[in-house]
């Protein structure tokens, strides 16, 4: 089993990272492999609802100029996904919101039950 931990904090080794590291440590104790991916300050454009991802049929966003397709590829290889983010005005970080919108639109069906 493999779990992908997504760090949506702009602070690379802040509180969110610390919490995800503890989760990774506990998973390792259980014999579960994990990987932490940091998207905090990496460029992520918002979804423009062009629909090209559904026309392509490859579970990828047509815009391949940021971290979105990389994360989708990692998510395909995992059995579970854990997302960590600071909370700003009751929401996750902006980068994480954009990432979630695009990856769920482009490849949402393959993430069912993860």
PLM features: residue spans?
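N-terminal beta1-alpha1 ligand-phosphate binding loop
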Residues: 2-32
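Glycine/Thr-rich phosphate-binding loops of Rossmann-like dinucleotide-binding domains
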Residues: 14, 57, 91
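Short, glycine/charged-enriched secondary-structure capping and boundary segments
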Residues: 18-21, 50-52, 95-99
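Short amphipathic alpha-helices and their capping/turn segments at secondary-structure boundaries
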Residues: 25, 35, 70-73
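A short beta-strand-loop structural module common to alpha/beta enzyme folds
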Residues: 32-43
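Cysteine-cluster motifs in flexible loop/terminal segments that predominantly coordinate metals
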Residues: 42-75
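Helix-loop-strand module that forms the ligand-binding subsite of alpha/beta enzymes
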Residues: 62-114
């Amino acid at each position: 089993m493999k779990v992908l931990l997504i760090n949506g904090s702009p602070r690379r080794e802040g509180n969110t990272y610390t919490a995800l590291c503890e989760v990774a440590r506990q998973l390792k104790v259980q014999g579960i492999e994990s990987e932490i991916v940091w998207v905090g300050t990496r460029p992520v454009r918002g979804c423009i609802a062009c629909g090209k991802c559904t026309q392509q049929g490859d579970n990828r966003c047509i815009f391949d100029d940021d971290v979105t397709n990389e994360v989708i590829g990692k998510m395909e290889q995992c059995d579970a996904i854990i997302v960590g983010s600071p909370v700003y005005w009751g929401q996750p970080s902006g980068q994480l919101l954009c990432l979630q919108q695009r990856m769920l639109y482009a490849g949402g069906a393959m993430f069912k039950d993860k």
